[in-house]
Amino acid sequence: MFNKLVLILNCGSSSLKFSVVSSDNYTTKLSGIVEFLNLSQIRFFWKIKKKEYVRVINKSKSYDYALNYILTKILKEESKIFNNIACVGHRVVHGGVNLNKSVLITQEIIKLITDACSFAPLHNPINLLGIKASHAVLPHLKEKNVAVFDTSFHSSIPKFAYLYAIPYKFYKKFGIRKYGAHGISCQYSVCRSSELLQIELTSLNIIICHLGGGASVSVVKNGVCVDTSMGLTPLEGLIMGTRSGDIDPSVIFFMNKQLNLSISTINNILINKSGLLGLSGVSSDFRNLESEYNSNIRIKLAIDMFCYRLSKYISGYMSVVKGKLHGIVFTGGIGENSSLVRSIVISKLAFLNFKLNSDINMLMKSGKEGFINIKNTFPILVIPANEELIIAKESFSEIN
């Protein structure tokens, strides 16, 4: 007999994660991922109990196709699971000015998420596709769809940290300020760090490095976020797969006036053609870059720049907690799996008494969790991201 289940749709800019989680003990009944969307190949991978399934389509398919395949093929073929879905939880990257906590999705909420698309142009439109698809395939659950926002976690950031030094009216009238992202992942890292470090949540001071196709670093003081690297949009901060991260704003004006590039073209360059892809000239996928770190000068430069900027943010955030840090967390696809990135970054922080256990660091990947620091030095943790657990808990909380 199945307990009530929540279907979780985590629609990202380059992948689509899905899972079905039980309401009683949050065990996963089904999970999967769709990768390489909008390229020449689409790969479906899913797991039910201990059985694994893979389907590869050597043709570019739309996001709509992927969503419909998940909902009408993979899920419907598992009738015991499909028939016990009680609600649908959606990761939504940006809540905009008005949405800073999880909510049941209504037409009004859809409008507010749509209004926030300008803050997250890569993500919110895709998140809305997930909502639309679940409404179409699961119409009986239309009033039991829940939006869980990445920006909610960062709503505790103080005003002096989230404002930009531009005329104040732009904040008051248009909501131009720092909002952050990766908040759901950070929320899980905070909860899990508290358990692993055996420190009360309300006393916990940590720095969380969520490193994937998108990358950010956040500092948590007394259990709540007090600053983060991403800003008004997920473009600010660290170097990312295809995003530039921090640049001098005048670069935009220079490219517009001197190179005669339109604002929309520049926007596309900074979001889709920069970062690791732009620097390396090879790929935005870290898995394709890491193996050539020592043999390709441009790839080495890209990775070194990525690590340099991250180490600067970490050392700067140490001052926010006045040096009273309980640990650094690496999470996200790169954070969890790249021993190279962790090694380079931590080597730059040795003066702060951060030291890696090289042997353990090399082995820490593929879903493993734990400490990778040398004994009696600052704790360094690898915590696999589990946004789905947070979304499940928030979704059940909202419908109940």
UniProtKB/Swiss-Prot annotation:
Binding residues annotated for substrate, in chain numbering: R91
UniProt pathway annotation: Metabolic intermediate biosynthesis; acetyl-CoA biosynthesis; acetyl-CoA from acetate: step 1/2
Site features described as Transition state stabilizer, chain residue numbers: H182, R243
GO molecular function: acetate kinase activity; ATP binding; magnesium ion binding
Active site (UniProt): D150
Pfam families registered for this protein in UniProt: Acetate_kinase (PF00871)
Domain of life, source organism: Bacteria
Cofactor note: Mg(2+). Can also accept Mn(2+).
Enzyme type, top EC level: transferase
Family membership noted in the UniProt record: Belongs to the acetokinase family.
UniProt name for this protein: Acetate kinase
Species whose genome carries this gene: Buchnera aphidicola subsp. Baizongia pistaciae (strain Bp)
Taxon lineage: Bacteria, Pseudomonadati, Pseudomonadota, Gammaproteobacteria, Enterobacterales
Gene: ackA
